[in-house]
């Protein structure tokens, strides 16, 4: 639970003797940082010395205060994973995490310390292979997938209730107008997917990945359809089951604690919201083969998933970043091209409609971050310590920066078979 991660020994301790000279660590990392001259970084070293990298006064400016020499060792050995670990452990600090990550993204191809960088100069990220092996040992097989999901989503329903909106939705919202609340924007997102599916009361919808029941609740209340929803998270299953009973719609929803690979039957429509990232590249064809198997001949499929550029998918597949190690084990972002390839290899589904919501996700994450920090006394009351809080803040704003910079995005995509009369 919350205290278990805090009790884990610092990974730096086991490798601190790999390169004995702290001064050497600093010189190597500083040589890499000095290549990152886009934007502006105000950098304060442990001895109080202030350095300015890039152009002062630049619109993309950030600050980084390095508090302990351990920062340099972490970055030298583990690149951007070590950078995030240094923040969580208090080896460095900043007045704005999002601005700092945005600066790093702006310089992505100028430093070998960051995942996805094409730069091979200097010997940073020396122990990347250890993180990579750790990641490879957690493929999303039936048994491992449950463990990977539980590690993030089973932190406790009470924890997520503190900072999610009343719909209990943990995926990007979709803003129709600037004045909408997060709750309204989440409902807007659900309804956009329902509209893409051309949902009617006669439909039987399969939802792969239940979350806490937000989509199923909206679809049944608004359109009167039936929903079969599957999840492998025990905590989410229990919350959703109680929710459907409370809302008086349990008779319209077949909620299952079931792996998507075990789904049988035929469904008029299929929806899945930000579940595909948890598949890993290895199981993407398996996922689409199952969808192709269960969707009716004239059915529609609506997917919301986080994307990376096609040009970087191979690099992301071969590497591992801080999010994959510390937040979503076993995960991998997908490119639109890779998803289309998987759909084509396993059947005749093809892309009919695509909407990009990248900036909507940046706003969603900022709203979560604001609410999370407003509820810190309650977060601590659940047993989460300051280290966990730093980790969660880094996670939320790391992602917000990535979406705001268009480094990654999120899409709503509708798939169909050829000659579908619903689309005429």
Enumerate the predicted regions with their spans:
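Conserved SAM-binding loop
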Residues: 240-241
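Conserved class I S-adenosyl-L-methionine
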Residues: 201-211
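Feature captures hydrophobic
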Residues: 1-186, 192
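A short acidic, Gly/Pro-enriched loop at the edge of an enzyme's catalytic core
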Residues: 261-270
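Conserved beta-strand signature within the Rossmann-like core of class I S-adenosyl-L-methionine
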Residues: 298-306
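A short glycine-rich, Lys/Arg-flanked "PGG" loop and its adjoining helix->strand segment in the class I
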Residues: 285-297
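Substrate-binding/catalytic lobe of Class I Rossmann-like enzymes that use SAM or dcSAM, i.e.
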Residues: 307-423
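Conserved SAM-binding loop of SAM-dependent methyltransferases across substrates and taxa
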Residues: 212-223
